[in-house]
C-alpha cells in the first residue's frame, strides 16, 4: 500500500507536461537494408543520432557485425552521432541470460562492448536486448552499470531500447503474465536511466497476434506509458519516446495449432499506400489515436490497415515536446512517409 501511495504521489508531482527549450534529439534506427541506408544518406542533416541495428552478441560475450560504410561516412560528414545497437540474436532469451549469469562471459562482454565503441570511434552503444526474463531484471541492471562505467571511461555513452509497460501489474490473463515475465518486466526503468545516459521507450507495436487489431502506437497508450515511466522518477532528459515510422496491415491467417486468427504485419509507407489502392480503401484519421485507419472485406472477412503518416508522426513528436523529453527514437528510417522530412 505504501508503494502504491508513493506511486500516486509521483504521478501527481512528476508526470506533468513541461516545456523543453532545446530541440528534441532525433534518433533514427537503421538497418543495413538499402532502403534504410538511402533514406539516411538523403536526410542525414535532419538526424541527431543514427542507431543502426548492426551488432549481435553471443552467449560468451563475443560480438560481431558491422555498420554500412556509407552510413559511417555520412554520419561523420554531417556530424550525426553514431550509436549502433547490440542485440541478442533472434532475441533469444537463453543467450543473454547466459551472459548475465556466467562471470567469464559477462566480463568478456563488458570488455568487448567497450573495445567496439572505442576502437570504431562510435559515440556510444545502445542495448537492444529483448525477450529477457523478469527474473534477470537485477542482473540486467547491474550488468548495465558495469558496461556504462566502462564506456564512460573511454568517452562513450550507453543507452538501452526498452520494451514499454504502463504498470507493474502483469494483467488478468495467462498471456498478460507471460508477456510481462518474458518481455516487459525485465526493465527497471529508473535504475537503468540512473546508470545510463538515456533510455529509448519502444512505444510501438502496441497490439500483437494475441490481441484484437489496433493502432501501431495509439496516442493515449503512448501517453500513459510516458506518464508511468516519469512517475517512477526517470528524468525527462533521459527519456526518448519511441515512434513508429511503419504502418500495420491486419489480415486473416490459419495455422494448425491456433486455428484462424488475425495477423499484423509491418509495412513501409509506400507499401501501405499500395495495399490501400489495391483494395479501393482510404485511411480515415482517428483523432483520439492520432493514426489513420482503413478497413475492407476480402471474401467477407474484415482486413484492417493502421497508417502512420507525417500527421501521426508530428503528433508524437509533439508528445515528446509536451513532456519535455530528451527526444524521440524512430523505428525505422526508410519506412517513413516522405512528408515527415518536409
Where in this protein do the model-derived segments appear?
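Glycan-recognition patch characteristic of GH18 chitinases/ENGases
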Residues: 22-112
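Acidic/aromatic/glycine-rich contiguous surface patches that form carbohydrate-binding/processing clefts
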Residues: 312-342
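Substrate-binding surface in catalytic domains of secreted glycosidases
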Residues: 60-62, 66, 133-276
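Sec-dependent N-terminal signal peptides
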Residues: 4-15
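Glycan-binding loop/region signatures in secreted carbohydrate-active enzymes
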Residues: 91, 245-318, 340
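Active-site-adjacent "subsite" loops/lids of carbohydrate-active enzymes
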Residues: 90-120, 168-187, 204
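Short, acidic/polar
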Residues: 31-44, 103-118, 181-190, 309-319
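Conserved, mostly hydrophobic/aromatic
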Residues: 50, 127, 199, 241, ...
